[in-house]
Amino acid sequence: EFQTDFELYIDGIIGKVTATELGVWPGLEAFIVRTPAPAPGAVDLVGMPLSPVASAGSDAPELPEDAGQGTGKRVVYQRSSQRVWAIDEDEQVVRSYLVSGSRYRNEVPGWHKVYSRSESALGWDLQADLPYMIRYTQTERGHIGFHAIPSWRDSGEKLQTIEELGQRLSGGCTRQAPQDAEFLWSFADVGTRVLVL
């Protein structure tokens, strides 16, 4: 009942997601693979600058076993590790980076397709700017997608820091460092497949 009341993933009497929300899950950081910050000026496989939480090619963490190997260009988002991989047609990891996904159970696992994009969007409450919004699914509460870390419209203050990426902090969408959001904007056109694990 607690999980349903607070819209958490129902994962047992007190499973990982509920325990994480309560702040009582031991070793939560063990699920998050933090790669060393790239060297100044480092770029990914298509020449775009890497963020402090990004890596590319052989420096990227290994893809999860269930990441749809052999299925072509796609974006893979693994909720447990709070990580995204962008994979090209040749099965190369163009870029991988930490994100901040939803605290709630509104990230629908499975295959999706990008169906809408907005270079600038507003949050559901019209209080926050969401740069580089890429939508891939919709729930009864609204669109779910990837975007840069939002900022409050009235003050311009960011809702979180880049250092906080890797933690579930959003209300639904997947937050990215600005450089990673700009990269994904160039990589994921309408029709690009998204796999949520």
PLM feature spans:
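Short acidic, glycine/serine/threonine-rich helix-capping segments at coil-helix boundaries
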Residues: 1-24, 31
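Cell wall/extracellular polymer interaction/catalysis modules
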Residues: 18-120, 131-133
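Secondary-structure transition/capping residues
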Residues: 10, 29, 33, 191-195
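Exported/periplasmic cell-wall-interacting domains
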Residues: 13, 68-70, 107-111, 118-197
